[in-house]
Swiss-Prot record:
Protein name: Lipoyl synthase
Top-tier EC class: transferase
Chain residues that bind [4Fe-4S] cluster 1: 56, 61, 67, 298
Predominant location: cytoplasm
Cofactor note: Binds 2 [4Fe-4S] clusters per subunit. One cluster is coordinated with 3 cysteines and an exchangeable S-adenosyl-L-methionine.
Lineage of the organism: Bacteria, Bacillati, Actinomycetota, Actinomycetes, Kitasatosporales
Gene3D superfamilies found in the cross-reference section: Aldolase class I (3.20.20.70)
Family: Belongs to the radical SAM superfamily. Lipoyl synthase family.
Length: 328
């Protein structure tokens, strides 16, 4: 086994250790069926003809057919180099290029061209920037909202899947002020193995960021990836901790190893357990839950947002539903 990564750099000791375990064979239930409806076909042709780029097609997301049929798509901002390394993530770690201040405008134009109902914006951690990339994330939301303000079907809704910005108050305030319809920050795994899987993040800090977003009035969301060494009991505890922190929406998925350099798959969670976890999360009190082997954090994102809003409005005092909807 070569100790050189595909990008030519020397592999980290952790990556060398990971590479000693061959890529695991997927169970038969890890498969998708291509269902190409008319809206998907339109989107596919548009993306190709306009030279647009979305995470959906570039990452080979298994849910692209359903999401594009609903006119939903995900965009990656901030470049292709992350300043942090998570042991499950396929994005490379390294020194990012200089901030592209025109990127938010271009993303907004892509959203307009694709006539999206719902856009998820995710990106890399930018600890190299003085503001941690807060302006970039916020400005992308502002551009999408501004450029789609006159859309016949209504302004495109934006979900911001963001890093933790080290929980810096000024950086969080910048991001929150852009008022994305949903603020998502993924904890991804349970406390016991968190530091090993996500050494650049802190579990309690992530919970704090979710709480801050909820206190600001934003709809909040997170994700748990299963199969990296957690126990069933730890998943239940993490769900309770997320809900207590103010998380309203949750997605639960199976870890799929990007390459031999990444953390080995420790278990394949069977479909019935995902069903059980969905029921458990709903009993805990989450407004919306998506749970399944091929669910991703942006899967059916627009539907989850709508579930959160319906619950907020039904829980609002009489005459207060309008206030609840304006809060996001």
């Amino acid at each position: 086994m070569s100790a050189v990564a595909p990008d030519g750099r020397k592999m980290l000791r952790l990556e060398v250790r990971n590479a000693q375990t061959p890529i695991e064979r997927k169970p038969e239930w890890i498969k998708t069926r291509a269902k190409m409806g008319p809206e998907y076909t339109k989107m596919q042709n548009l993306v190709k003809s306009e030279g647009l780029h979305t995470v959906c097609q570039e990452a080979g997301c298994p849910n692209i057919y359903e999401c594009w049929e609903d006119r939903e798509a995900t965009f990656l901002i901030g470049g292709d180099q992350c300043t942090r390394r998570c042991d499950f993530c396929q994005i490379d770690t390294g020194k990012p290029e200089a901030l592209d201040r025109d990127e938010p405008r271009r993303v907004g134009e892509s959203v307009v061209t694709m006539d999206l109902n719902y856009a998820t914006i995710t990106g890399v951690a930018r600890d190299d920037l003085e503001d941690g990339g807060a302006w970039l994330y916020a400005e992308t939301v502002r551009q999408i909202h501004a450029q789609t303000a006159g859309r016949e079907a209504g302004r495109t809704k934006v979900e911001l899947l963001a890093p933790d910005f080290n929980a810096e108050p000024d950086q969080l305030a910048e991001v929150f002020s852009a008022r994305p319809e949903v603020f998502a920050h993924n904890v991804e795994t349970v406390p016991r193995i968190f530091k090993r899987i996500r050494p650049g993040f802190r579990y309690e800090r992530s919970l704090k960021v979710i709480t801050e977003a909820r206190d600001y009035g934003l709809v909040t969301k997170s994700n748990l990836i299963l199969g990296m060494g957690e126990t069933r009991e730890e998943v239940s505890e993490a769900l309770r901790q997320l809900h207590d922190a103010g998380c309203e929406l949750i997605t639960i998925t199976q870890y799929l190893r990007p390459s031999v350099r990444h953390h080995p798959v420790e278990r394949w969670v069977k479909p019935h357990e995902f069903v059980e976890l969905k029921e458990e999360a709903e009993e805990i009190g989450f407004s919306g839950v998506m749970s399944g082997p091929l669910v991703r954090s942006s899967y059916r994102a627009g539907r989850l947002y709508q579930m959160a809003m319906e619950l907020r409005q039904s829980a609002a005092p009489q005459g207060g539903a309008q206030v609840a909807s304006q809060a996001v």
